């Protein structure tokens, strides 16, 4: 019986060894699968990290593009407002230039009139009133006279027609205005024609 017990035990032992080998093989196989899964997992994580980095870069690029587009729209809006403002201010430029000879002629008529003649006096008063009203109306639209007599010569506002020696005036001073200049909303549309002291 002891032999039989030994035999059974040997058979059982063989069976246990066989099962242990199977378990070890299964464990090795499972370990290999786990390693493979771990490698796949690491590869997938690396792939996902790369995709995330790429997406973050794209988002940043898109945000930069949106900011640039907003800035461009703001600049365009500002330029358009400035152009509209400039167009409003200087829309009357050509019209104002055409009115200047009318003002000049009214002033010449006032200067040339004989103030002693009683017949002409009422006409002269009418011309003076017309001139004053006309100048006041165009001033409402930004047309302003440049009459620099006695001021320092400024080439931005004055056009020197002649330069003469004068003991009564400082050098580079406007002695005489031959024709008044005009500006429209701060922009010179006709410089004053002047005689300058040397």
From Swiss-Prot:
| Superkingdom per UniProt | Bacteria
- Which SUPFAM superfamilies is this protein grouped with? Coiled-coil domain of nucleotide exchange factor GrpE, Head domain of nucleotide exchange factor GrpE
Q: Which keywords appear in this protein's UniProt record, sorted alphabetically?
A: Chaperone, Cytoplasm, Stress response
Q: Which Pfam families match?
A: GrpE
Task: Provide the primary localization.
Answer: cytoplasm
Q: Which InterPro entries match?
A: GrpE, GrpE_coiled_coil, GrpE_head
Task: Name where it's found.
Answer: Cytoplasm
Which molecular function term from Gene Ontology is one that the record holds? adenyl-nucleotide exchange factor activity
Q: Name one GO cellular component term.
A: cytosol
Its GO biological process annotations read: protein folding
Q: Which family does it belong to?
A: Belongs to the GrpE family.
Q: How does it assemble?
A: Homodimer.
* Described function: Participates actively in the response to hyperosmotic and heat shock by preventing the aggregation of stress-denatured proteins, in association with DnaK and GrpE. It is the nucleotide exchange factor for DnaK and may function as a thermosensor. Unfolded proteins bind initially to DnaJ; upon interaction with the DnaJ-bound protein, DnaK hydrolyzes its bound ATP, resulting in the formation of a stable complex. GrpE releases ADP from DnaK; ATP binding to DnaK triggers the release of the substrate protein, thus completing the reaction cycle.
Q: What is this protein called?
A: Protein GrpE
> Where does this protein come from, organism-wise?
Vibrio parahaemolyticus serotype O3:K6 (strain RIMD 2210633)
